[in-house]
């Protein structure tokens, strides 16, 4: 279990919060110096998401409202979610990022319904509000228990035919702790196990293509 890597929970969360307070509020900052992969990432995410938005019949996922978790300055909100949804809510632990988002998003930012400044371990989505809850590059900042609990709360936040998407780094064998930003990169089988523990069913899994060889494999998981 990856939580064995977390010796002190308070320190685990506090160290991460301090790390992000010192990151510049830019796309490059959000991506740890890999701002150049943003377009490839967003194009892959759009393709993955649209298979649910374009489904025929009664299983189609709606496009009224999405939630961007660990939203930062709004990189995903701006380029992926606002073009596809009528309203987007954003949640992030760093107040400076959410303040920057208001200028970064430009005119379309008027369609952001709520800016929530909160750690995901303490955040509860409004029940029955969201068609899509997008959780990218942030589950490593939650312990296993807090991730399972957060996913359970997210499930309650979904509208009919709504989905939760996790997109994150994974390893193929053992989970790895990053002491710099205080995060865990989990093995892929553990991610699947924690999703199942939360009472969710995986609908689709896809590896992001065309990323640099030196970074971890990145997978998207859709579930409800």
Swiss-Prot record:
Signal peptide from the UniProt entry: none
Classification via CDD domains: AdoMet_MTases
GO process terms (BP): chromosome segregation; N-terminal peptidyl-glycine methylation; N-terminal peptidyl-proline dimethylation; N-terminal peptidyl-serine dimethylation; N-terminal peptidyl-serine trimethylation; spindle organization
Catalytic reactions of this protein: N-terminal L-alanyl-L-prolyl-L-lysyl-[protein] + 3 S-adenosyl-L-methionine = N-terminal N,N,N-trimethyl-L-alanyl-L-prolyl-L-lysyl-[protein] + 3 S-adenosyl-L-homocysteine + 3 H(+); N-terminal L-seryl-L-prolyl-L-lysyl-[protein] + 3 S-adenosyl-L-methionine = N-terminal N,N,N-trimethyl-L-seryl-L-prolyl-L-lysyl-[protein] + 3 S-adenosyl-L-homocysteine + 3 H(+); N-terminal L-prolyl-L-prolyl-L-lysyl-[protein] + 2 S-adenosyl-L-methionine = N-terminal N,N-dimethyl-L-prolyl-L-prolyl-L-lysyl-[protein] + 2 S-adenosyl-L-homocysteine + 2 H(+)
Pfam families: Methyltransf_PK (PF05891)
Subcellular location as annotated: Nucleus
Protein origin, superkingdom: Eukaryota
Enzyme class label: transferase
Keyword terms of this UniProt record: Methyltransferase, Nucleus, S-adenosyl-L-methionine, Transferase
EC number: 2.1.1.244
An example Gene Ontology CC term for this record: cytoplasm
Binding, S-adenosyl-L-methionine: 70, 75, 92-94, 120-121, 136
Any one GO MF annotation of this record: N-terminal protein N-methyltransferase activity
Known function: Distributive alpha-N-methyltransferase that methylates the N-terminus of target proteins containing the N-terminal motif [Ala/Gly/Pro/Ser]-Pro-Lys when the initiator Met is cleaved. Specifically catalyzes mono-, di- or tri-methylation of the exposed alpha-amino group of the Ala, Gly or Ser residue in the [Ala/Gly/Ser]-Pro-Lys motif and mono- or di-methylation of Pro in the Pro-Pro-Lys motif. Required during mitosis for normal bipolar spindle formation and chromosome segregation via its action on target proteins.
Family, similarity comment: Belongs to the methyltransferase superfamily. NTM1 family.
UniProt name for this protein: N-terminal Xaa-Pro-Lys N-methyltransferase 1-A
